Amino acid sequence: MEKKTIVLGVIGSDCHAVGNKILDHSFTNAGFNVVNIGVLSSQEDFINAAIETKADLICVSSLYGQGEIDCKGLREKCDEAGLKGIKLFVGGNIVVGKQNWPDVEQRFKAMGFDRVYPPGTSPETTIADMKEVLGVE
């Protein structure tokens, strides 16, 4: 089986690197080819990496609470760049303050994200979802 490629990074002005490294390690050990663009990454960084590596999925992390602002328009930019249909996952502390999670999840799905994860989601949960949406056993 050919490995599926995932672009992983921390979006916006967020410099939280530890969780990013944990996800990189977990996704790699699960059999994915991980292209980790690191922290302080723009939407364009994710898109360019996905184009260059022919990625199957983009996984966006955000821990500083501004993910909703940073992620707005990503699906449209992916489509415009020729990445129509690429899977988009987002997770972490993606909004400011305590908000009703189903509302947060709905807003991100309306922005075009395929999966939306709250703080504390295990890498195993994300891996299972990646395998499901990418058709990996």
Swiss-Prot record:
Keywords from the UniProt entry: Cobalamin, Cobalt, Isomerase, Metal-binding
One of the GO BP terms on file: glutamate catabolic process via L-citramalate
Annotated EC: 5.4.99.1
Protein name: Glutamate mutase sigma subunit
Role description: Catalyzes the carbon skeleton rearrangement of L-glutamate to L-threo-3-methylaspartate ((2S,3S)-3-methylaspartate).
Cofactors: adenosylcob(III)alamin
All copies of domain B12-binding, residue ranges: 3-137
Record note on quaternary structure: Heterotetramer composed of 2 epsilon subunits (GlmE) and 2 sigma subunits (GlmS). GlmE exists as a homodimer and GlmS as a monomer.
A molecular function (GO) term: methylaspartate mutase activity
Binding site for adenosylcob(III)alamin: 13-17, 61-63, 93-97
Catalytic activity: (2S,3S)-3-methyl-L-aspartate = L-glutamate
Gene that this sequence comes from: glmS
Entries under Gene3D superfamilies matching the protein: Cobalamin-binding domain (3.40.50.280)
Family: Belongs to the methylaspartate mutase GlmS subunit family.
Organism: Clostridium tetanomorphum
Pathway where it operates: Amino-acid degradation; L-glutamate degradation via mesaconate pathway; acetate and pyruvate from L-glutamate: step 1/4
A Pfam family matched in the record: B12-binding
